[in-house]
Each structure stands twice: as C-alpha cells, then as structure tokens.
From Swiss-Prot:
The organism of origin for this protein: Cochliobolus heterostrophus
PROSITE patterns listed in its UniProt record: GATASE_TYPE_1 (PS51273), IGPS (PS00614)
Residues of the Glutamine amidotransferase type-1 domain: 25-225
EC numbers for this chain: 4.1.3.27, 4.1.1.48, 5.3.1.24
CDD domains found in the cross-reference section: GATase1_Anthranilate_Synthase, IGPS, PRAI
Transcription as UniProt keyword: no
Biological classification of the source: Eukaryota, Fungi, Dikarya, Ascomycota, Pezizomycotina
Reaction(s) catalysed (UniProt annotation): N-(5-phospho-beta-D-ribosyl)anthranilate = 1-(2-carboxyphenylamino)-1-deoxy-D-ribulose 5-phosphate; 1-(2-carboxyphenylamino)-1-deoxy-D-ribulose 5-phosphate + H(+) = (1S,2R)-1-C-(indol-3-yl)glycerol 3-phosphate + CO2 + H2O; chorismate + L-glutamine = anthranilate + pyruvate + L-glutamate + H(+)
Name assigned to this protein: Multifunctional tryptophan biosynthesis protein
Gene Ontology terms for molecular function: anthranilate synthase activity; indole-3-glycerol-phosphate synthase activity; phosphoribosylanthranilate isomerase activity
Superkingdom, natural source: Eukaryota
Amino acid sequence: MPSSTLIDHSPRNPNPSPPRITASNVILIDNYDSFTWNVYQYLVFEGAFVTVYRNDEITLDELIAKKPTQLVISQVPDTRKEDVALAIEPLRTSVAKSPFSACAWESCIFYSYGGTVDVTGQILHGKTCPLKHDGKGVFAGVPQDVPVTRYHSLAGTHGTLPDCLEISATIPANADAEIKEVIMGVRHKEYVIEGVQFHPESILTEHGRLMMRNFLKMQGGTWAENERLQKEAHAQAIGAAFSESAMVQRTDSRTHLQKIYDHRRAAVAEQKKIPSNRPVDLQAAYDSNLAPPQINFPERLRQSPFKLSLMSEIKRASPSKGIISLSTCAPAQARLYAKAGARPISVLTEPEWFKGSIEDLRAVRQSIEGMANRPALLRKEFIFDEYQILEGRLAGADTVLVIVKMLETELLERLLGLSDSVGMEPLVEVQNTDEMKIAVKLGAQVIGVNNRNLVNFEVDIGTTNRLIQMVPKETILCALSGIAGPKDVEAYIKDGVGAVLVGEALMRASDMSQFISELLGGPYKEVRASSSSPIVKISGTRSEAAVAAVEAGADLIGIILAPGLKRTVTAETALSISEAVHKTKKPNVSKSGLLADSKTASDFFDHGASRLLETISRALLVGVFRNQSLEYVLEQQRLLNLDVVQLHGQEPIEWAKLVPVPVLKAFNPQDHGIGTRGYHALPLLDAGSGGSGKQLGLSDVKAAFTKDDGIKIILGRGLEPDNVQTTLAGLDEYRDRVYAVDVSSGVEEDGQQSLDKIRSFVKAAKSL
C-alpha cells in the first residue's frame, strides 16, 4: 500500500503554553456543532481558561454578567438567518471584546451587518485551499498560501460586503467563476471582531495554533485600544526578560527596544506593499537564483589568524552612543576590516537609530566580491519576519541576527528554519539564562551574548562569562558589545569564547591593524605585495625570442592573436611558441609571497597577482586578443593551451568570468571599471592600443591609484630597459601597487625583437 502524503498539523504531541493573562476568562458558545471541542483544545493549548456553554443554556444577560475576556462562538451547522440568530445577538450587543469564530462566524458577521451569504459555485466542504491574507489580526506572522480546511461551500459575497467590514483573507475561485477570489475572512474596521470561513483547528490547516494565539492576545473593544494595550504588554515583557530573579514593574514608558521594534514592524509592513519589494517579488528573485554565492558562517568563524575570531561592525550611529560617523563609507570600511583579519562583518541595516540600510549590505557584499577567504556578512537588524531573512539573503548576507528577547519561541523557531532553508546559519542573540536555554534547545550553532542591557544600555562584559557553561562544546559562543580593549578579551580567551564583536572602538581606531593585534593577542600583519621584484611580461613575442625571454627570467610571454597587427603571429607560429614556452624552464623559481592564507582575506587583485606568481618552473603563455568574438578567444585558449588571456580591446568586463584561465584586461587610466572586483585578475594600464610605445603619464597612473586604494596593476607605458627603474621610482608611494611591467616595442630594434634588449629589460626590472 503506498505511503500516505497527508500532512497532519494537529497537536498530537502538544507543548501547552503557560496561562495567558489576556485570555483568563474565555467563553465558548457551543452551537451544537461537532467541532466545538476541537476549538476548545486549541484554545486551552494556547494558555486560555475556557468555559463552554450550549447556546440554550445561558441567557444574554448572564453572558454579559460573566464579563468574558474573549467570546468564541462555534460554527453554526446551518447558515439560515433564523439558525444563526443566537450567534448574532451577542455580537450586536458588543458583549465580547474580541469575538472570534472558527468557521461559519464569517457568515454570521455578514448577516449581522446586512451582508449576504451565498453558494460559491464550487464544492469546498472538507477541502484544503491556499489562503491569501493581509497579515493582520489573527493572521499576523502566518505565511502566505498556508493550507486551510473549508467548512462548507458558502461564503459572504463581494457585492454585499458591509461598509463596516474589510476582507482579511481569500482563496482562489474556480477558473470559470465570475469572481476571482472567495472570501475566507472578514474583520470589523473599528471593533475587534474577526471571522474566518475555515477550520483553524483542523489537522489539515497549517499554523492553526498561531491564529488562535493571535486571537487570544487581542484586548480592548476597538483596534486602536488593542494596539495600545499590545504595545504596553510587549514593552513590559521585554523589560521583564532582563531580570532573571524578579519581574520588572510595568511602566507606561516604552523601552528603546520596543520603540525600534514597533518602528521596524510598521516600516517593513509598508515596504512589503511596494511593487518589486513585495514578498512574492523577493521569492521570485530567490527562485531565479539571484542570491549571491554564500559561505558557511560557523566555519568562517573558526578560521581566524587570532586566538579567537574578530567580528567587526559597520554602523553610523547607535541608540546608546548617538551619531558615530555619518560619513562612513560602508564598502570601503568593509575592505579595511576584511584585510585586517575580521572573520564576519556585521552590517547594521536599521535606518532610524543606526543610520543603515539594506543598500549598505548590498554594497559591502559587492566590495568584497572575489576576495580570497572573504569574511562572512551578517545582516544585523531587528528580525521578526521571514521577509527580512529573504531580503538579506538576496542582498548578499551569509547570516542574520535573531534576538531571542524579541521573539516568541514558535516565531523564533520558524525564523531559524527559514534561515537554514536558504543556507544561512543565524547568529542567535541572548542575554540571560532563560534565553540561553531556548537558543541551546533550538540547536543554534552560533550564539551571541549581548553584554549590553537593551533597556537601559548599561554594559556588563561578565554576562558572557556567566553563561558560557550552558553552551555545548560544538557551539560557537560570541561576546557582543562593550569590548574596548585587551583586558576585556583576556578572560574570554581563557574561558574558550569563540569570537568577540567590536563596534565603535574598532571604527574609531587610528591604526586598525595595530588595534586588532593588541586586542586579540596578535601578532598579525596584513598580507602585502613585495616591492622588490615585479613580474615581467614580454609582449609581441615571436618564435626566436620566446625561449630567450624565458631563459632571461621573464614570467609572462605574450603572443598577439588579434588579426591585422604588425606583431600578430600565424596559427603555426603560435603553436610553435606555445610548445617552446611550455617546455623551457625558468632559471630561477621563487614562491610568491602573495599566496593566500586560508585564515585571512586578501583583496581580489592580490589574489589575482598570486595566480600569476604561484610557484611554477616555467613562464606563463599569454594570448592577446582585441575585439574578437568570445567563441574565438575560447577556441584559441584551448588550441594553444594558453595560461592567461589578455583582452586589449572593447571586450565586456564580464567575459573574464567565462574564460577558464586568468584574464588581464587593458584600460586607459580614464576608463571605467579598472577596479571592478571579481572579473579580470589584474588591470593593465596602457596609453593606447598596445605596442605603440606611447608614453603614459605618471600623473594619470597616480590618479587611478588615488581613486581606489586597493587597486593593483600591470604597467605598460612605453617602457624600455633604460627607463623601467626610473619610471617605477617616479610613482613614489604607489610603487608597491605595480605588480608587473609589460614591454613590447621597448625591446625591439628596427621592428624586430632584440634578444639583448629582452635580457637587459628583464635584468633591470628584476633588480628593483
């Protein structure tokens, strides 16, 4: 017998919630419906104290006298007006502060306010349908297209929707129906009255308990009053969470955390309405594989050049310190952090109090594109919605922050599950033993302890040490906030803390590398290029000069494969040169000092240079192309076994990712895209089309360096044996950023390559 595909959402092994103060006197009216006690079960599991009355066992006056916190009226087996009269009467007299029905109550609400209920034109009894909803009221936090089980085939009609009601949920109608959607939920615009036309308590309805929980949180007779009371309750809960031994007395003033939380909820709700920013738009982008490549966050934390891992942070302001630096350039700061040894970089994306945005995250991700062993990117935000996780992933985040203090356990578990489903192991933030227990129980691999009290912003760096014994050995524990100097870190190293987050202190450090080394018990030095000897490229090489150039110590041998140029070689000659270069040994082999360290990040151009300087016993063969088709370039690379491809025309920069070997791209210093990371291994700065011997002004070269302090180049500017040393010396402090020199006409006599000039040029360049 085939296995069943039935998904059972019933609470067979329930985890009952503690008693809920807001639901201390729930009255459930049983309209002789068979599902009443299923509804009762869900209400009780969510912490409600429920009393059940048959509709003919209690009068309206008696019901009013009992002062229920909520009134739930069960499904009505028949929807004729005379059969729902008992259900309508309590609603009309506004006895309950938050009336709610599991199914037919939508019909009752329609009848009560003058609407019409009619057949839907399709048989729906007992069927499951994907539900679309507005995310408010009972649907807060409920995913879209959640499967729900229908009660019957009747529903309120669109044309008779009372003015005082709004549609809160729908399901798709039949393709041949006159309407596109069947109404599945309605809500009173002013009063706290909600109704649905399906079974939240059904085993086939997903997130039914969440809907019940949302309902039981509702207070007050109007939505305005409910919002006020909920905000006060949330602020009180957050304040109470900071005390492990006593309840914090409730106050009317909201905490800073609550203010930020409320502001972000409202802002995200509005953002989700914008075309291109809607949840469906983000999901479509993710399904189209538009999220950038990611790395494993826990593993990156373990790969540190220090005794523990450094977590850096980019933020322009904070609630505790105010404005830090509004002029901070997030992508530039990220490159500094990465090369200084930071393993993750935390990017604040909250705009109001931290002056960040999701665009900061996207720009930072682009700035470290192509870095070898790049740091992981953390989206630091007040995460409360799956939408924010997907938004962060699409912007390039490798991980996200989730704060236990802000989230109920079920929502927290759901957010962790979604984060895992998109390949991101989150950083779970806690501050006390209760929160740590939750994080450990949910299996968090990386737990951060916030040393800062989020209510009064006081810092106690001992908070992390007090909680470390609760953390499983395989879990990485991070100390967050309040770390300013080496003494703050010493105890963490001794106790086995895996990482520390340093924010303002690092951003304000005058010498970042020195500060980090002293803070984390270095030593650590940023990987830099050696200025002693640039690599040498001989271009326009013909057969007779190839072997001589290699034997002289040249590192790169360039052959011109673009048609119509005076140094272009034939296919036969190109094959001959390829064979000679691949067989001829270099006189001296030295290991590059630029080879990437697996525990540190290196700029893309440092990595590009290391690929050209890696330990190898022969020179590398470079094929030079100009404005030829990509197909031709790929074919020649394969036929000639080219080690490197040089694009010397107007070829798109993106081609570099389509060529299976390192690519050099020629630029004029005024061109755009010279410093674009992730494509060409190194840019070649040249004055003209190549081989012209035209001088390239050093001021232009320096200007290119000034625009991008991480750019490294190959210099080709009319060099020759007599001027290569003086030219490089003329670059002053930028000398180290010339990784290679390229010569063509400078080693020729009467249009022919001179073997003596080749030897002289290599000797002069290697003598630097």
